[in-house]
């Protein structure tokens, strides 16, 4: 009797142990499962010509490719209401739009832009250019002044109910007193509650910055990526995502540990913009990281 009981207990214990081992392995495999992008945005400036020619057909095509969110400022001859309604009809969501800091410092212009953004149900108001001029030869005090301007705009955006973010170019990746890059001054001197960062991976790389190091050092500051590649020529010009030298897999893997929420395809200039938009999303959908 005891022998049978012991055998049954042993078998049950062994089975439970096996189930536990398999469950543990499944959890480990799930934890290690590579991630993929399920939602990918597009900045509509990529398709200026196409939008001017046939904005409805272009948006239908963009939605069919699998894009989910749009960053834009123009309505291409339509009212904001009709543009918004058509976007919803084809399954696209408004995400962001913006102005330069010079425009944003004009209170009436900023408030009008925010009102339009809120009507369109955008989440972000973007500062695309933090300088009152060309942005060349900036010193420490210039970066501190820019940070102060950004904080002020961010405060207005907060009051009106929209998140504010700054978009970088290569101009911010110059050494200044006490810092490897002037961009770090903007990160340290802006209030995270008022100012998020939209990290343009092309401009960071072209400027000599390190996207992965930035994500490691400031994991809570970045909320959006602009995704375009650096080509393989000495000029380091724009190219479609996946065509150039940027290691998006490594960057996105690091981004999993940060506040990054949105990945937005952009290409400032392309010979065949629609092809580039298609190739970029195809590459990003197939990327595992």
Predicted segments with their positions:
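Acidic-and-aromatic substrate-binding clefts and catalytic sites of carbohydrate-active enzymes
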Residues: 48-53, 71-82, 100-109, 133-137, ...
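N-terminal secretory signal peptides and thylakoid transit peptides that target proteins
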Residues: 1-19, 25
């Amino acid at each position: 009797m005891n022998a049978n009981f012991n055998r049954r207990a042993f078998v049950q214990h062994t089975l439970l142990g096996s189930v536990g081992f398999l469950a543990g392995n499944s959890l480990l495999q799930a934890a290690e499962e590579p991630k993929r992008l399920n939602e990918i945005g597009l900045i509509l400036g990529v398709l200026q010509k196409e939008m001017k020619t046939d904005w409805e057909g272009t948006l239908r095509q963009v939605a069919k490719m699998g894009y989910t969110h749009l960053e834009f400022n123009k309505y291409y001859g339509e009212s904001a209401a009709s543009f918004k309604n058509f976007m919803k009809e084809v399954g696209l969501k408004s995400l962001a739009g913006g102005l330069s800091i010079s425009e944003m410092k004009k209170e009436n212009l900023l408030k009008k832009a925010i009102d339009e953004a809120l009507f369109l149900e955008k989440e972000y108001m973007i500062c695309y250019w933090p300088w009152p001029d060309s942005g060349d030869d900036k010193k420490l005090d210039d970066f501190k002044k820019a940070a102060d301007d950004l904080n002020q705009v961010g405060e207005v955006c907060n009051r009106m109910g929209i998140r504010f973010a700054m978009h970088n170019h290569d101009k911010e990746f110059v050494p200044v007193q006490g810092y490897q890059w002037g961009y770090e001054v903007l990160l340290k001197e802006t209030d995270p509650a008022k100012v998020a960062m939209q990290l343009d991976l092309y401009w960071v790389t072209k400027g000599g910055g390190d996207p992965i190091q930035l994500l490691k050092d400031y994991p809570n500051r970045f909320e959006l990526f602009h995704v375009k590649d650096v080509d393989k020529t000495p000029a380091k010009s724009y190219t479609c995502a996946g065509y150039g030298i940027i290691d998006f897999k490594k960057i996105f893997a690091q981004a999993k540990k940060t506040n990054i929420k949105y990945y937005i395809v952009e290409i400032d200039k392309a010979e065949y913009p629609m092809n580039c938009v298609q190739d970029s999303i195809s590459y990003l959908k197939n990327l595992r990281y």
